[in-house]
Curated annotation (Swiss-Prot):
Family annotation (InterPro entries): Nuc_sug_transpt (IPR007271)
Membrane topology (UniProt): Multi-pass membrane protein
Cellular localization per UniProt: Golgi apparatus membrane
Protein name per Swiss-Prot or TrEMBL: CMP-sialic acid transporter 2
Keyword Transmembrane recorded: yes
Main location: Golgi
GO terms assigned for molecular function: pyrimidine nucleotide-sugar transmembrane transporter activity; sialic acid transmembrane transporter activity
Gene Ontology cellular component terms for the protein in this record: Golgi membrane
Organism of origin: Arabidopsis thaliana
Record function comment: Sugar transporter involved in the transport of CMP-sialic acid from the cytoplasm into the Golgi.
Swiss-Prot/TrEMBL keywords: Golgi apparatus, Membrane, Sugar transport, Transmembrane, Transmembrane helix, Transport
Residue ranges annotated as Cytoplasmic topological domain: 1-41, 97-148, 194-201, 267-282, 345-406
């Protein structure tokens, strides 16, 4: 049995296995359920560590970019420059990959390859547009919350992503994994609890309403973008990731440039200077955002969106400590308790015990399907053997099964 195909041990002919069912194109077609190799584990560790560093630094760099609580630059210009940096990286890596192609492989830089890949990856325009909206919201969220709180709120994306993965990509989660996600929400809620002193209960309604709206969009939009991005990258798995990134970042640059044009129309030609108000901190912010986006593409294609979001929760500790050390933000007991529950949730979600029952049920279902398929094929072969004297054999998923007597 290989890739849902049953192979005969004599003639090497292949047929689609009756028990193979396409649950999800993006997961099943590319061996998503195979045992994780040592190289895959090393890649996952590298992705998680890199993501923790980059995601943890982002809100700190955004906070450092503010002057008197405001941005002297246009956030859209930062997003546009970030996309340009990622496009340049994708082009350089694509040229490097093309120079090291093996003999007989289809050239990556040919016009036909580029056009065909562009047609097959048009779906990447959807997450690119959603990311353009989300990148602007990252700056807006800093006006309402401190960096550590922004990271805790972003953890809400895990639950939304899980629901979207179940709806769009038909991915299944065990009961223990759903309970782990519930624990994650509890941990985030504990962190958000604040005891206000007397006389401090009045909050400006426009600011509070704007914060809630931004939080809802901040959680929903990137979650939808991540799921569509993972589906688009995995559905065209044979396409070079750097070629896919070139399309994704190209779409993102176009959307952000349209945002700049809209700003020019609204504020006047003076706002067209995309470098206005930038500082050394914003340059580091652009490089950090570019590296984070590039790393995310490897998460979505070779790892998992849930792993990506859970790894971002680890960055909360780094963000909280850094914001406390650099900006004097206080690490409350609620924050420490919330972080503890988040880590318990992460351990429970990825624990082998959380997957054992689900995998056992799947194995039983596959075994029953295989037995039913074998009985059906046995009946058909016996009928054919009684009607003809010609040699015949049956194709089984197990090559050790002997051929029928002639």
């Amino acid at each position: 049995m290989k890739n849902g195909m049953a192979e005969c041990s004599v003639c090497r002919s292949r047929l689609v296995s009756p028990s193979s069912k396409a649950i999800s194109r993006a997961y099943d077609n590319y061996n998503y359920k195979i045992r994780v190799s040592s190289k895959q584990r090393a890649l996952n560790v590298f992705l998680v560590v890199g993501d923790c560093m980059l995601v943890g630094l982002q809100p700190v760099l955004v906070y450092m970019s503010k002057v008197d609580g405001k941005f002297n630059f246009s956030p859209i210009s930062v997003n546009f420059l970030t996309e340009i940096a990622k496009v340049i990286f994708a082009m350089v890596m694509l040229l490097f990959q093309a120079r090291h192609q093996k003999v007989g492989e289809k050239p990556l830089l040919s016009l036909s390859t580029f056009v065909q890949a562009a047609r097959n990856n048009m779906l990447l325009a959807v997450p690119a547009g959603l990311y353009a909206i989300n990148n602007y919201l990252k700056f807006t969220m800093q006006l309402y919350f401190n960096p550590a709180t922004v990271k805790m709120l972003s953890n809400l994306k895990v639950l939304v992503i899980a629901v979207l993965l179940k709806m769009i990509m038909k991915r299944r989660f065990s009961i223990i994994q759903w309970e782990a996600l519930a624990l994650l929400l509890i941990g985030i809620s504990i962190n958000q609890l604040r005891s206000l002193p007397e006389g401090a209960t009045t909050v400006a309604v426009p600011i509070a309403t704007g914060a809630y709206i931004c939080t809802f969009i901040f959680v929903t939009v990137p979650s939808l973008a991540s799921v569509y991005n993972e589906y688009a990258l995995k559905s065209q798995y044979d396409t070079s990731i750097y070629l896919q990134n070139l399309f994704l970042y190209g779409y993102g640059a176009i959307f952000n440039f349209l945002g700049i044009l809209g700003t020019v129309i609204y504020k006047g030609p003076g706002s067209f200077d995309i470098l206005q108000g930038h500082s050394r901190a914003t340059m580091f912010l652009i490089l950090n955002n570019a590296a984070q986006g590039i790393l995310s593409s490897f998460f979505f294609k070779y790892a998992d969106t849930i792993l990506k979001k859970y790894s971002s929760t680890v960055a909360t500790i780094f963000t909280g400590i850094a914001s406390a050390a650099l900006f004097g933000h206080i690490l409350t007991m609620n924050f420490l308790l919330g972080i503890s529950i988040v880590f318990i949730s992460m351990h429970q979600f990825f624990s082998p015990l959380s997957k054992a029952k689900d995998e056992q049920q799947n194995g039983n279902i596959e075994l029953v399907d295989a037995k039913d398929g074998h009985r059906a094929k046995d009946s058909f072969i016996n009928m054919a053997a009684g009607a003809t004297e010609e040699a015949s054999h049956r194709i089984e998923s197990d090559d050790r099964v002997p051929l029928l007597p002639r």
